[in-house]
């Protein structure tokens, strides 16, 4: 069953706060929204077959791969759908390389799960159809 989330939906707010914190390099703010058993699979990690398990590894990814490479990095959720116990989030991420100055503006989708009021899982997709299939919807 799919339903569009209302702005007041608690799970939506958790995701919004986590990504706002990451987008502003607020590491402590992001950690506050992560479940102790979080599994994060950002786009680059998915390409390498990696996952970051636990808040400390997500923080290491943020500090060692994002904050050192990008002058700014923004995750901008635009639409949320609940599919069972998970969320399908669509939006974009924007970034500018520190050394290269290259700017990115990429459409993205995320499959997200929230448990106990914290993000416990997320995977980033640049192929919306693949994200839909992953969450059990038609591509």
Cite the ranges covered by each PLM segment:
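Short, low-complexity N-terminal intrinsically disordered segments enriched in polar/charged residues
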Residues: 1-36, 133-139
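A beta-strand edge to alpha-helix "cap/lid" segment located at domain peripheries
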Residues: 1-7, 63-139
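Short hydrophobic/aromatic segments of transmembrane alpha-helices and their interfaces
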Residues: 12, 40-41, 103
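Hydrophobic pocket/interface hotspot
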Residues: 15-18, 30-34, 38, 54, ...
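A solvent-exposed, acidic/Ser-Thr-rich amphipathic alpha-helical stretch
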Residues: 27-29, 35-85
